[in-house]
Structure formats: C-alpha cells, structure tokens
C-alpha cells in the first residue's frame, strides 16, 4: 500500500475566494476611513476658506466695506481677509474722525449716507461651528462601538456561567437587547442634558460610561458582567449620539436640514460597516477581549478629537414658551403632538423593527439554514450599509429639493414592506442578497428625511425644542429596536422563514398606507402641510 497526497481543488478555491473577499472588505473599510478624513480636511482647509474669501471679495467689489468673517486658523486666505479688514478698519476710523470733526450739517449727512452705504461700522458675526466639526469625533467613537458587533453573542457564549441570569441561549441575545433598552430609556434625559450643559461637554462626559463599559467587558468573567458592561456603554452612546445630532441640527440652515442629517446617518453607516469588518478580523487574530482594548483606545482618540474640534460657538437654541397648564414631561409632550406621534408609530418604529428584527436576526438565521458560511452572512449584512453610504447624500439632496420630507418617508416605509415580500417562497442566498440590497436602497431615502419630518412636526408645538424632538424620536426608534427581534423570533417559532418575511412586509406596508391616508386627511383639512 502507498499514500498518494492530493489537494482538493474545490476546498482550495473556496479558501482563496474567502481570502479575496476578506481582503476586499478590509480595502473598503480602509477607503471609507480615508474618505472621512479627506472630506473633513478638504472642507476645513480648502472649501470653507475659499468660500469665506469669495464672500468677502464679492462684498468688497460691491462696495461693502464691513469687517468680514475671517474664519479660523492662520492660513494665507485667513490672513488675506484680515488684511482687508485692517484696510476697512482704517477707513472706518477716518470716517468716524470726520464725523466727529465736521460741523456742517450737509457734509455730516453725506458722510452718514456713505457710512450706511459702505457698512463700515458693521461687523460680521463670527460662527466657528461647522457640520464637519462633529464628523470625525463621531465616526471614531461609533467605529469603536461597532468593533464588537460581529462577535458579541459568541463572546457571551464563551464566558457563560451557571450563575448568569438566564439560560445560555437567552444570555447570548440579552446584551444586545439591554443595549437598545438602556438607550431608549436614557435618550430623553440625554437630550435635556445637552440643552442644559451644551454639546461639547456632554460629548466628552458620554465617553466616561462608554469607556467604563468597554473596560468591564474586557475584564468580564461571566455573561452578567458583559450584560452590565454593554448597559453602561449604552448610556454613553445615548449621550454622544444625541450631542452630535443636536450639534449638526444647530449648525445647518433650515433649507439643508435633510442634507445635514445625511452627514449624521452617513457617519453611522460608515462606522458600522468599518467597525464590524475590522472588529471581526481583530477578534480572529487576537481574541474577543483584545478587541475591547482597541475600543478603549479609539474612544480616547475620539475624546481628544472632540476636545479639539467641537465648538461651543453655536447658534442660540430656540426658546419656546411653555404654557403653564401643560406638563413638561417628555412623554406628555410627545402625546400632544399628533403628527409627531403618527411619524413615530407608523414610520420610525416599523423601520427599526425591520432593521433589528429582519436584518440582525432573521437574515443570519435564514442564511445559516441555507448553508451559507459565516463570511457570506457577514458580507450580505454589510451590503446594507454599503448601499446606504453612497445613496444617502443623493437621497437627502433630493428630499431638500423636493421639500416633501414626510411623503418621502411614507413612500419609503411602504416600499420597505413590499421589498420583504421577495423572500416569500424564494429560498435562495441570491434572493436574500437582493432583498438586503433593495432594503438598503429604500432606507437610504428614509433615514435622513425621517429626522427632518419629525423636527418639522415638532416645530408645530410651542413646548418642544429641537433637541427634545430628536431625543424623543431616538427613544421611540429604540423601542422598535428592542421589540423587533422579539417579534420576529416569536413568529419564527410557529412559521417558516418565507411566511415571517411576508407577514412582516405586509404589516409594514399597511402601516405606511395608513400613515399616508391620515397625513392626506390632515393636509386636506389644513392642519398640517
């Protein structure tokens, strides 16, 4: 007898294909990180200085000799504008001296007309805040947070002990549900804290519980420890995201709100994709716990970036007078605004149910039943973010031009339900891939307009601030995030995958149609436009 060595070509080809796609994922993640840095640097060092210089030159050419906004830094363009301001200040001082010395009434009137026409005594208000200030700090923190997403259930299973609160299967999903639940509970309080103490201090303060949660997970010896660590991190996540979202909402003008919110959504999507991919690779190389050390490191970097980049020079928040007979409770405030409640119940919550229940729970289980590999499951789930990232700016710009954010949200809600029907009696990995891609495209047209539509509805109430509306919206969305996996898991106990997808899709589409009918009825009565 003799042994003949051989190589299974199919196995080798499969491994090479897996390596190729893993390398591609890393390349995409690194490219997105580089893109975030390039966008911020180009905006702060090129676009904004040239915009400020162009505005100053156009005003000077038109005879407007005010003190122009010079921007930040000591670059050539900023120094050029400061030189113009010096010349204008010299003319202003000479004009002031002439006005003080001239006694003739006619000459004084002509000098006063020159002063009004040239605006020599006007000084532009200096606003240092920009959307780009929050982009990099938010991205780095969210990147740190998403590092554990791909392996958290496996991490809990590895450290499960008999003394944990529940059985092993329940404990594997409990930290995820706890994370969403804590965010839902704490977000309204986070919004109030931002209004009281400001965006920058709260961003930095939110990093304390976030880092504490990462450290607790690193030191964890049981599922209970991981559960507590993720709950602690959720407090920091709620504070930081509301702080950055309110910061962006404060800076952008009303006409560009959807585009400004698209920056927030785009950062979250980019960080989700990059963090999930890089975290999986780090866990494979170094182990689960080492990833939390990287999360702590990136969170500290986010703290340094937030300290250096976030500005305290923000426009004053709107101050609305609250009638004495109205409660200041956030829940009571929400219930009094019917349009806000409709958006939350029929659009925001269903969108999160689809995201957490379908994408995070249904898709992995369904693909595993179709004998897809773990790498294939990860790539399919990442496609959702990959679709949203490039489409979100286009969708938000389209919503700004159309000026119909509410109807954009309604149509996208109906479409997201219809998309899920594609899985009914279609059991294939390719069909799941197509549905996830289509869902990403639909949600690209939903995410930013949903935030704007909620703020527009909130502005109709005299006692809801911008930050309060955002926090209430986020709280409601987290409720959908908590109940989504529970609802889908309950249906999977008694129904097959195709039936669950069909029921979920039909339900969401019907909710969207009900929202359309109610909104059209309100519009016809003139109560909401």
Language-model features: locations:
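Structural signature of the two symmetry-related core transmembrane helices
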Residues: 201-215, 296, 407-421
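Helix-to-loop junctions at the C-terminal end of transmembrane segments
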Residues: 185-198, 392-403
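Membrane-proximal alpha-helical signal-transduction linkers
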Residues: 46-67, 81, 85-95, 99-102
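Juxtamembrane intracellular "pre-TM" segments in multi-pass secondary transporters
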Residues: 114-128, 311-344
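Intracellular juxtamembrane helix-capping segments at the cytosolic ends
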Residues: 239-252, 446-460
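Cytosolic-side ends of inner-membrane transmembrane helices, especially those
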Residues: 30-47, 61
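Helix-start (N-cap) segments at beta->loop->alpha junctions
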Residues: 4-22, 162
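Residue-level signature of mid-helix packing/kink "hotspots" within the transmembrane helices
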Residues: 180-188, 272-273, 385-393, 481-482
